[in-house]
Amino acid sequence: MKRMKLAAAALNQTPIAWEQNCQNILSAIAQAKAQQVDLLCLPELCISGYGCEDAFMSQGVLATSLELLVEDLIPHTQCIAVAFGLPMRIAGRTYNAAAMVVDGQLKGFVAKQNLAGDGLHYEPRWFTAWPANEQTLVQVAGNKLPFGDVTFRIGGVHVGFEICEDAWVEERPATRLASRKVDVVLNPSASHFAFGKHQVRRQLLVAGSQIIQGAYVYANLVGNEAGRAIYDGDTMIGVDGVVVASGPRFSYLDVVLTTAVVAVPVTESLTAVPSELELSETAEPVTVGATEECAWETSTVLKEEEFARALSLALFDYMRKSYSRGFVLSLSGGADSATVAVLVKLMIDFAVKEIGLSGLAHRLRHCFEGSVPETPKKLVGELLWCVYQTTRNSSEITRDAAESIAHAIGARFYELNVDGVVEEYKSLVSGVLQRKLTWDRDDLALQNIQARGRAPSVWMLANIKRGLLLATSNRSEAAVGYTTMDGDTCGGISPIAGIDKAFLREWLHWLEITGPEGGEPISELRKVNAQQPTAELRPPEENQTDESDLMPYEILDLIERLAIRDKMMPSEVLRVLQQHELIASYKADRRQVIDWIKRFFQLWSRNQWKRERFAPSFHVDDENLDPKTWCRFPILSGGFRRELDALE
């Protein structure tokens, strides 16, 4: 048997950021060599970046990826075997490929057989799936090399591949690799984060290692690679159905290695591409791995922990990769803007804990013109500007909540009275119409002008700071258009537009009382959590609340999941709701349930144009409403009139 040290890398890559991507790859190779790794698996498409989208159609992107592999990366692979991910064009078709390099020599390429085409994935738009059991030859750097469904013998060890989605299909390549007596399977992945997905990947890794009765190496991206998708850096190594090594998730490092030493048999194969790599002999089936899973991974509130860490890391990468000098936030004193504010604070906390204040300051050096803040709280004040914009309909409750949250986390706090701006607009329009605007006649317009009147000042602050303006809409509001376009939707990124309001309220209560593992709760959130969500756009005496305008958020979110995620028609939604325990808890009769269903479908259909214009949002689950990458719906439609009439 041969003793082999395996490594899976998590890399924080960026599409078409050639220099940085290569720097990360070379760092991973250097770290692997320093740890005496024999075989290193890098993530899927790591040279070009996974999220290049239609840039994959550019011949220049394909040519540059191959050029960098041959000229800049391969020369650093002496005494180690490395799998690199890159796009390859063969006979007029583009493939998602992995290059196998052993001891400075390019040995061949494996092409992905199953393309991801669901959810936010559009791989079939750019790539062609490679047929199983087929190979061809490709000319690279003067050599004819095998390309396709290829396996390799590295120092006598038989190595094969599953590339990300390959492991998720029912007839996965691992079964065929087992029949070829493969000892090690490498899985270079770009598997985006979603709640609970870590356990699914773990099961796939365990099953893969059982199928081949050998070792399985799973590499992945980490961070916010291209803007919307978040990668958790989930890296694992399994042997014979047991996870022997697992890396940390949501790291603020650009490169993280997970390693394990395994004993693998020497097998003969007439079809595998041979290569020489010196491996030591061992008589024992030894397996030595290192698991760096943190305590929060076993938390009873894992979803809350994952949300805190995923969105914080996504904000960090979005800020630094866009070269923004921090954030600006219209802090209303409500749940949504409070969530966004504390996520920035958690971003600083998590980063400082992992890479230290000096390390964080170095990563964000473009943000500071003078001296670097000396404490994490002062760093929050440098990076986050919050502004409370009051009108005559604002309350002291929300103002106090906004100021308390800002001071608790260390953010800079400003207050602006925009009532004069709103009144000036009302006066101008009244003059044009030659009548007074009234709440009875002009309710919606009078609400919206307040939200829109806040936009210019907060945009101006963002321009002055050269910071990123954060929008605060959530998924529940996006579903029914309960938001003012060019008002509270203003921003360069909408961090929480992919999560429902009910969960956000639960998360804020958790953060008030408990907080993340290793961190502290933020008790000042009680001033937010004690409130009923309200837009504060109507006169105070009307006691406006979101749920009185719409329906209970729990009901709204349930209908949304059934109608949009599960693609149910109104009659199907009604059948489910009539038997649902949540409806029973509200003691709602059939008439009320029908009214809720009608309101949802009507508002959903009417407001697709708003969802088309939302700032980009982060993906955290399988219920996103982003029309560009997840849920497409016509801007103009019949609005389910026939189906809704049939409910009566």
PLM regions and their residue ranges:
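Enzyme catalytic cores with a strong preference for nitrogen-chemistry domains
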Residues: M1-S330, A341-F368, A408, F413
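ATP/NTP-dependent adenylation/nucleotidyl-transfer catalytic domains that generate, transfer
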Residues: K2-K5, R153-G155, Q213-G214, E225-A226, ...
